[in-house]
Amino acid sequence: MKIGFDNEKYLKIQSEHIKERIAQFDGKLYMELGGKLFDDHHASRVLPGFKPDSKLRMLGQLRDSIEIVIVVNAEDIEKNKVRADLCITYDEDVHRLRDEFMSRNFMVGSVVITHYNGQHAADQFRHRLEREGIKSYVHYPIDGYPHNVELIASDEGFGKNDYVETSRPLVIVTAPGPGSGKMATCLSQLYNENKRGIRAGYAKFETFPVWNLPLKHPVNIAYEAATADLNDVNMIDPFHLEAYNKTAVNYNRDIEIFPVLNALIEGIYGENPYKSPTDMGVNMIGFCISDDEVCCKASKDEIIRRFYDATNKMADGADNESEVNKIRMLFNQAKITTAFRPVTTAAYEKKLETGQQAAAIELEDGTIITAKSTPLLGCSAALLLNATKHLAEIDHQTKLIPQSLIEPVQKTKIEYLGGKNPRLHTDEVLVALSVLSNNDERSAPGDALLAENCRKALEQLPKLRGCQIHTTVMLSEVDRKIFKKLGCGLTCDPVKKK
């Protein structure tokens, strides 16, 4: 995989910048955490070289200064709101987040239940936290929030909320999902800290959009594609332009809320040290791009991947036409079509040539490998074999998995397990290669050669990380998961298997 991002530089300058921001205030900073922390695969795809856990590793350098506060909305607890990606309720996710942080030796100080209005489920949740020895606090709804600044920044507004006791200079405020009340919790703490004579600060830690890249830079367009279902829009920050006569990129929701946020901070302190929403951020990721061309290509690939992801959801019955149309519009901004990815064209051509569903992969050196569906193998499984054989310099005509082994597996799938598709999936191919790679001294010469070839093929799997793949048919969840684990950028035509 070609590298376009200096991860070590990021770990260094991002942690230093956060320290500088803490020092600007009375040694106390409340930092609202946006985006993914544990597994930011989007960032790792558009910025090759960025590790999915880079932000967590960066915060690890500040571990002794960090205290984490997890925020959850009482209304979400009452409604049993579920995280779609994890299929767990928000209250369960509070425990998951706490366990994740603590397993990495971060201090989790407490849980704040926002929008509390006597909800029974919230009371039960709080009792559970108490039994487990976890501190909890409640924050109440405020009439006219966020516009009634006079009430909000008073003892009848933020002053009614529990004061969250913290002991470390950097308080990271995170939550199971949007709408939990992270920003309001930070501002409430600023008000209550100020009453106690501490001039604490507020900052936002979000990765995208990248403020110091051009508005139409592919990295920023890829962020819009990733949030097309939310209809987020990247914009030039007008407040930053007015204050400094410099362009900076932000997104519509932060720009829209800034006048309100500005008024609230002025209501607490009498003045706001930030002139723009961009000022509030601490993101240094744009300074760590080491090869812009690599990141531009990766981001364009990601825009196309998001398009196919959206069209696949539509093929499965989702009502997401607006999401698909939004990404089509982003194609124009990025000046690309699906043909930008050579694998897309190669897979189509293979399908036209053979009359079968097909797949293609682009290896790191630019070589394109293709495969088609056969009575024995699905196109994705065949592609995995063809690619690893090429990388291992095994003759293309050499059969790694004998038909005599495949046919009994197919019989089991159809006759005993009631399946409809006899072809082997990618996971079954990998298991077969693993079994066949085992060799002992009693093996016949032909078996020994087969075992050696299977071993050599398996050893090539790490070389597939970062490679782009396209198939002309929607793959099963099993195949999708295998390619995800291998680190491949997979797209599929919105065509369901018959």
Report each predicted region and the residues it spans.
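A short, polar/charged loop-to-alpha-helix boundary motif
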Residues: L376-A392
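Hydrophobic positions on the alpha1 helix immediately C-terminal to the Walker A/P-loop
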Residues: T185
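Residue-level structural signal for beta-strand termini and adjacent loop
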Residues: G201, S373-T374
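Flexible phosphate-sensing "switch/lid" loops adjacent to ATP/NTP-binding sites
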Residues: M1-I172, Q189-Y348, Q356, L363-D365, ...
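Substrate-recognition/cap regions that form aromatic- and gly/pro-loop-enriched pockets
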Residues: D395-E407, K411-E428
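Phosphate-handling active-site elements
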Residues: R196-A200, E393-K399
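Residues at the beta-strand->loop junction immediately N-terminal to the Walker
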Residues: T174-P176
